[in-house]
């Protein structure tokens, strides 16, 4: 993990050092990955160049504490809204900017730590924000935060079941048995290719978490 990344040149330099290290130790070149932590305004401004600077990039990580200091945010509680700001989420643009770059360059988006290790409600609230946007995970600083992080970044059982039902229904509808249609009704919901893509995201998260489906798809009677 490379902290306080500000530009692509820092990634390129680290890539070169890792290549030398791999060759010296007889390792496959490219085996070692890079996680870039965005902790200041300059890093956020250059995030597209950072994300695309090396094929070693595996994730973009938000570093909230140093970032808050770098933009003079008036808060002493890492990850919480600054006092007096009541018109929305002060972190929304930052999180979305990191997420957009991560998705554009096919790397993971990881939310940074929540320092109130005894404030589990606060951790749940802040983790829920980035999980809802589509982040892949969040740093945990204390064992008590791990279970909550796994919970927040895994889909609810009903959402996981529904995603698998959508995939099954769409696969059936587009097959010859289902009439090779481009859309189909699942209950009161019309599902199509866009629905399938959305379901794939939820399904993948559920499968990665080891979830088991509790519903099965039954093709409608012809």
Label each PLM-derived region with a short phrase.
Residues 1-222:
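Expand to "…catalyze enediolate/carbanion chemistry for C-C bond making/breaking, isomerization
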């Amino acid at each position: 993990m490379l902290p306080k990344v500000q530009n692509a040149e820092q990634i390129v330099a680290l890539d070169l050092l890792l290549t030398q290290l791999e060759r010296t130790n007889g390792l496959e070149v490219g085996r070692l990955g890079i996680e870039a932590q965005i902790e200041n305004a300059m890093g956020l401004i250059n995030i597209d160049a950072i994300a695309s600077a090396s094929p070693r990039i595996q994730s973009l990580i938000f570093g909230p504490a140093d970032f808050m200091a770098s933009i003079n945010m008036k808060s002493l509680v890492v990850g919480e809204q600054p006092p007096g700001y009541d018109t929305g989420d002060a972190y929304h643009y930052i999180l979305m900017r990191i997420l957009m770059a991560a998705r554009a360059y096919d790397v993971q988006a990881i939310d940074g730590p929540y320092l109130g290790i005894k404030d589990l409600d606060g951790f749940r609230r802040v983790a829920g924000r980035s999980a809802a946007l589509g982040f892949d995970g969040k740093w945990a600083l204390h064992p008590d935060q791990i279970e909550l992080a796994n919970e927040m970044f895994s889909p609810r059982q009903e959402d996981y079941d529904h995603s698998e039902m959508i995939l099954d229904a769409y696969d059936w509808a587009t097959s010859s048995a289902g009439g090779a249609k481009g859309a189909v009704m699942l209950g009161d919901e019309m599902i199509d290719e866009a629905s399938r893509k959305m379901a794939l995201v939820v399904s993948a998260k559920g499968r990665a978490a080891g979830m088991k489906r509790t519903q099965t798809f039954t093709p409608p009677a012809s």
